[in-house]
């Protein structure tokens, strides 16, 4: 049985939740989100808590049970608090700045790398730190991964773009023969 699916979700102030058939509608201060469950789980909304139940006892139904509960929880947390990812740029001459609706980065290529900032996402650059904020956990993680992919950290000097909490395993360079 799913241990994740069993836990009810407390709905915080500032977030409204309504159920319409197999759809769950979430309304926050700034935006609205919806989650379609396609009838794979039963949805119960009562007294400021949202809970899910299995439709039947098949393994696939139990997997959906925990998945939809986690997705709903991520939407509620995103609408009430938001999600943040922080990237660090390390390297001589590597820098980033925001111009208009684009993130411009100098990453050692012969051209600047330009990444368009999607709607619903806030980005800020402070020295060599890029901060990405938004309500959609999946989107924030995807954007951070795409930016990191332009210049992932290399193991010898640690140059590149890395997550702020990422540890780079460093390698020793070549040793000379004597």
UniProtKB/Swiss-Prot annotation:
Domain of life where this protein originates: Bacteria
Gene3D superfamilies xrefs: Ribosomal protein L6, alpha-beta domain (3.90.930.12)
Pfam families: Ribosomal_L6 (PF00347)
Record flagged with keyword rRNA-binding: yes
Keywords for this protein: Ribonucleoprotein, Ribosomal protein, RNA-binding, rRNA-binding
Biological processes annotated in GO: cytoplasmic translation
GO cellular component terms given for this protein: cytosolic large ribosomal subunit
GO molecular function: rRNA binding; structural constituent of ribosome
UniProt family annotation: Belongs to the universal ribosomal protein uL6 family.
Assembly with partners or alone: Part of the 50S ribosomal subunit.
Function: This protein binds to the 23S rRNA, and is important in its secondary structure. It is located near the subunit interface in the base of the L7/L12 stalk, and near the tRNA binding site of the peptidyltransferase center.
PANTHER family linked: 60S/50S RIBOSOMAL PROTEIN L6/L9, LARGE RIBOSOMAL SUBUNIT PROTEIN UL6M
Descriptive protein name: Large ribosomal subunit protein uL6
Protein source organism: Helicobacter hepaticus (strain ATCC 51449 / 3B1)
Gene encoding the protein: rplF
């Amino acid at each position: 049985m799913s241990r994740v699916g069993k836990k009810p979700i407390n709905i915080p102030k500032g977030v409204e939740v309504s159920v319409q058939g197999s759809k769950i509608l979430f309304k926050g201060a700034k935006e609205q989100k919806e989650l379609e469950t396609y009838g794979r789980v039963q949805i119960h909304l009562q007294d400021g808590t949202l809970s899910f139940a299995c439709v039947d006892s098949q393994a696939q139904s139990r997997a959906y049970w925990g998945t939809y509960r986690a997705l709903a929880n991520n939407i509620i947390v995103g609408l009430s608090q938001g999600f943040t990812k922080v990237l660090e740029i390390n390297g001589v001459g590597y820098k980033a700045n925001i111009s208009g609706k684009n993130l411009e980065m100098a990453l050692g290529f012969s051209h600047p790398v330009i990444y368009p900032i999607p709607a619903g996402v806030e980005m800020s650059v402070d020295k060599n730190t890029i901060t990405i904020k938004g309500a959609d956990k999946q989107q924030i993680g995807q954007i951070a991964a795409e930016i990191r992919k332009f210049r992932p950290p290399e193991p010898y000097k640690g140059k590149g773009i890395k997550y702020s909490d990422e540890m780079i395993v460093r390698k020793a360079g070549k040793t000379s023969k004597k």
